[in-house]
Each structure stands twice: as structure tokens, then as C-alpha cells.
Amino acid sequence: DEQTNRSGQLFFKYDHFGLSFRDFDNYLPGKDLRVTIRKGSLSTVNGFFRLQDVTLAAKKDSIRFSTPLISLTGIRIPKNSIYQIGFDRFDLSDGDFSMSWGSDTTILRTESQKDIQLALENVFVDLKKKTFQLGDLQLQTKDIDIPLDNGFYRLKIGGLDLRESGLRLDHVHLVSPYSKMEFAYKQPKHQDWFDVKVGNVRLTDVDIPGYFSTKELHVGGLWINDVLLQNLKNRKIPVEPHIVPMIYEGLQKAPVRFKIDTASIANFSVVYEELPVKGDKPGKLYFTDMNGQFSGLTNIVSYPEQFIRLHADGNLMGSGHFTATWQLPVDSLYDRFLLDARLDSLDL
């Protein structure tokens, strides 16, 4: 009875509580993860939760994460519901992540990411209604280096800055550790060599909270600047005949359903080289100074024969100016694209 605070059974009531601890060192259930915390504190009076010098280490494959500070401020727990919780801000500062592979005695490879800054603002969770509200997500880090395709490529990003519904990536480079002439000999399927450099990528009005409720990502604007795509096909190496997927198939099969209101690409160059069977020097075809505007950039099918439209212009082989409109199908079941192009005089 909450009016009299009397009961025939055990009765417990509280308004606020707090706790603090030091030098925590123990395994999580299952003993696969070990957690060490130098200092921790929680207060519902002040509405904060703070952990200092946190390390999370996995028993297998040497996974390790550490950060000098994890804090949660402005914690709000409604009195009328145990299914709801909110907070003003979550901070994770200067996080370091590393993962090593190898045998019991030898580490063969280690990947790491340092200087991770993560923050969440104005979060409210209702477990009963299964709703999630988020004011802002902030993530900053630099010098990202991710292995791809079993180490035959690495994705390098000089800087990542996500805040206030905007994302910026600087100095993006997809690069292989093998030279373009030896790549196809090293790659098990003898695939073509690629190298892609991007000056920066910028997205605005990224609706992250909306994604959690609709499972669709809505982006206001996308800008891609200063792109150099290089490709070499080595005909000296025989390969099984195969169909090369079209570029738009990657958009259709993307793991995230998305819609981008406006998108553009500026200063885009392509260099295609092909080494013939009976030759020592590759031939070259190149496009430079290309600029393009997208409309209807999405992989969400809304009506039959729906297209993404790309209006572009640039130069072919350094002298032939061209304009083109490329219509790409949104629906994977409609396997047809349309291309309307015009090339001015070309003098080779």
C-alpha cells in the first residue's frame, strides 16, 4: 500500500540512490570479455554515470578497447514507468580499438583505430513501445585504415566528422598494397586492379533518428569532390568469362534503403588502361574534368520504370567535350538503362 507504506510482504521504496567504486577488474558472464575500470560513480540525484580508464579485452583474437572516460549526464527515469529512460548526453572520449589475429604464440596481424570521439545527445528510449529518440549523434576520428578483400585493398580515410546531422569524410583512398602490374597475378581470381582517390565527401541533413523508426535513411544533400578512378585490365592473364555488374546494381543491393534529395560530383577523372596479350605497354582511355548532378537518387522503389537521372559533362581524351544524361533503374527487376550522350569534335 503506497499510501500507508505497509504490507504483509516485503516493501521497498526509494527516491534517489548512488554508488561509487574503484579498481574493478572482472570477466563478463561467459568469461570471454574482461573489463577493468579504474573508477566509477552513479548518482540519480545529479543524474550522471561516469566511468574512468575503461578497458574491454576479449579472450580470443586479442580484441581490445580502452577509453579514459565514459560519461552519461542528465539521466531521466520517469517515476511511473520502468520501461523508459532518457539522458541529455553520452560521451566516450579518446577511445582506442585494436584487434589482433594469430596463433597462441605469434601475432600475425593487428588492426587498430585510435582517437575515437563519440557522443549522443537528448536520447529517450521506451522499451515497451520500442521507440528510440535521438537529438544528435557525434563521431570524430582520423587516420582510418580498413582492410578489404582479404587484404588486397585497404580503405584509408584521413578524417571522419559526424555531427549536427552532417557527415564529412576527407582524403579517402582505396588502395592496393600491390602494384597495378602485379595485382592480377596475386589476386586469386585475377581481378582487375583499381585505385580510387576522393578529396572529400559531404552529406547534410542526415536523418539518423528517422532511420531507427522507418529503417530508411533520408539525406538532404550529397557532395563528392576531386575523384580519380584508375583501372587496369591485364589481358595476359586468362580468366573465366564473366558478367561485370553495372554500377547501379550496387545501389540496388545496398544494405540500407535510402533517399537523397540532391547529389553532385565535381572534378571526376577516370583512367582506364588495358594490357594486351601480345604487348608490353597498356593502352589508355581517359575522361577528365567531369561534373555531374543526380536527381531521384534512391533505392526505394515507388513506381514502375523509376529511374535515377545523372546529368554530366566532361572531356574525353583531353580534347573531346561531351554531355550526357544517364538514366539508371531503381528496381532490380527492371534491368534496363538509358544513355543519351553528345560528343563534340574529337581530335586524337
Q: Can you annotate each of these PLM segments?
A:
Residues D1-S165, H171, I208, I224-N231, ...:
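Elongated, acidic membrane-bridging lipid-handling scaffolds
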Residues D25, L343-L348:
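Short, proline-centered helix/strand-breaking motifs
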Residues L174-E182, L346:
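Surface-exposed extracellular loop regions of Gram-negative outer-membrane beta-barrel proteins
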Residues E182-A184, R235-K236, K278:
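Outer-membrane beta-barrel translocator domains and adjoining extracellular loop/strand segments
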Residues V201:
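Conserved, mostly hydrophobic/aromatic
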Residues I237-H242:
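Flexible, surface-exposed loop regions and adjacent strand-edge segments
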